[in-house]
């Protein structure tokens, strides 16, 4: 039986196995021994109960409801063992996606279709999703311009169709749907409440990220020493959004160390120009680092797009295929991608993929 780093049995094709010996009290991941009290077992969820069976079953007597007993230490061990296992597994990973907004989530979702690609998502907020929980000015609806609605069809998000765009009744419907589908995949791990403080640079190549708890990253000036951790990666996808406390941090760091010349910042709003430009210029800005989403507008000085989200989804998809190309795998950019994709999806031009330093 193959068990993912999260301790969930996954069947064939899992990248990392938690190997357990029958009768043994220890396991190992990537050569590191881990404690486990018993052999893990896969149990499928029971079929959803109807309202009639819910109230007729004695186990669901809401006036006398009883939970199975548990020791508090078991809860602590289960959480800690799985999280530490995930950290060990992703200390050296294939792709790190920095930022779990709509572009970062779309990128990770597209990457996760290849079960042999390990994906770690680093998000400084406790709640992933970036600005995609609401539309503009804290309104509920999300606007997606065609033809990006085909991505919504793929992940099965319902919408109201207009002539040139579609409307999702609440932005949270998109974000919750893509997260639930993405995080169920065994080759993906989301590290939320974790900040990318810096980059790992070897020569002229980005080779990973420097990480820390987000609360620590925001409070270095209050303590004497709170050193970070690291994640090595073959590819880093920076989807840190537009300017802000954690905004555009990837390209800002590249500028500060002289790997790119400038980060002019996004221009004033122009929806029609902005979305096309963001998808077109999603690219590998330096070897090992791909920029996607609104961070593209920050590095290029292109217009901001405001409360329309199609470019975030397609820019994220394009970033994923650029990452696959960097890994030497089939991808849509090179036209050799075989899995189940929409034939109507035509990625924007990929000329000049690497910006000059």
Curated annotation (Swiss-Prot):
Cofactors required: Fe cation
2,3-didehydroalanine (Cys) PTM positions: 225
One biological process term in Gene Ontology: thiamine biosynthetic process
Entry PTM: During the catalytic reaction, a sulfide is transferred from Cys-225 to a reaction intermediate, generating a dehydroalanine residue.
Gene3D superfamilies in UniProt: 6.10.250.2840, FAD/NAD(P)-binding domain
Comment on bound cofactor: Binds 1 Fe cation per subunit.
A Pfam family annotated for this UniProt entry: Thi4
EC assignment: 2.4.2.60
Catalyzed chemical reaction(s): [ADP-thiazole synthase]-L-cysteine + glycine + NAD(+) = [ADP-thiazole synthase]-dehydroalanine + ADP-5-ethyl-4-methylthiazole-2-carboxylate + nicotinamide + 3 H2O + 2 H(+)
Protein keywords: Chloroplast, Iron, Metal-binding, NAD, Plastid, Thiamine biosynthesis, Transferase, Transit peptide
Binding site for substrate: 103, 123-124, 131, 196, 227, 242, 294, 304-306
Taxonomic superkingdom: Eukaryota
InterPro entries, per the entry: FAD/NAD-bd_sf, Sti35, Thi4_fam
Function, as annotated: Involved in biosynthesis of the thiamine precursor thiazole. Catalyzes the conversion of NAD and glycine to adenosine diphosphate 5-(2-hydroxyethyl)-4-methylthiazole-2-carboxylic acid (ADT), an adenylated thiazole intermediate. The reaction includes an iron-dependent sulfide transfer from a conserved cysteine residue of the protein to a thiazole intermediate. The enzyme can only undergo a single turnover, which suggests it is a suicide enzyme. May have additional roles in adaptation to various stress conditions and in DNA damage tolerance.
Subunit structure: Homooctamer.
Family statement: Belongs to the THI4 family.
The protein, known as: Thiamine thiazole synthase 3, chloroplastic
Gene that specifies this protein: THI1-3
């Amino acid at each position: 039986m193959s068990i993912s780093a999260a301790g969930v049995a996954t069947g064939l094709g899992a990248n990392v196995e938690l190997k357990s010996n029958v009768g043994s009290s220890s396991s190992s991941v990537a050569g590191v021994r881990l404690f486990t009290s018993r052999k893990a077992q896969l149990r499928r969820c029971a079929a959803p109960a109807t309202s009639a069976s819910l109230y007729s079953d004695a186990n669901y007597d809401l006036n006398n409801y009883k939970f199975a007993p548990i020791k508090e230490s078991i809860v602590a061990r289960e959480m800690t063992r799985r999280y530490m296992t995930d950290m060990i597994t992703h200390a050296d990973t294939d792709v790190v996606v920095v930022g779990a907004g709509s572009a970062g989530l779309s990128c990770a979702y597209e990457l996760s279709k290849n079960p042999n690609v390990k994906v770690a998502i680093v998000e400084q907020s406790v709640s992933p999703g970036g600005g995609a929980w609401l539309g503009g000015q804290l309104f509920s609806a999300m606007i997606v311009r065609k033809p990006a609605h085909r991505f919504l069809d793929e992940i099965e998000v319902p919408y109201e169709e207009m002539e040139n765009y579609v409307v999702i009744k609440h932005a949270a419907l998109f974000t919750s749907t893509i997260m639930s589908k993405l995080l169920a995949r065994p080759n993906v791990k989301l590290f939320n409440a974790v900040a990318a403080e810096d980059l790992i640079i070897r020569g002229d190549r980005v080779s990973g990220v420097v990480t820390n708890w987000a609360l620590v990253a925001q409070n270095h000036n209050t303590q004497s020493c709170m050193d970070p951790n690291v994640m090595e990666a073959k590819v880093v996808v920076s989807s840190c959004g537009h300017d802000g406390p954690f905004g555009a941090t990837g390209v800002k760091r590249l500028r500060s160390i002289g790997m790119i010349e400038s980060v002019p910042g996004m221009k004033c709003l122009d929806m029609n120009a902005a979305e096309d430009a963001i998808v077109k210029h999603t690219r590998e800005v330096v070897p090992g680092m791909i920029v996607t989403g609104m961070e593209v507008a920050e590095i290029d000085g292109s217009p901001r797009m405001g409360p329309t989200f199609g470019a975030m989804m397609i820019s994220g998809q394009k970033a994923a295929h650029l990452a696959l190309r960097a890994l030497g795998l089939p991808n849509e950019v090179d036209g050799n991608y075989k899995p189940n994709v929409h034939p109507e999806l035509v990625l924007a031009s990929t000329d000049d993929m690497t910006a000059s330093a």
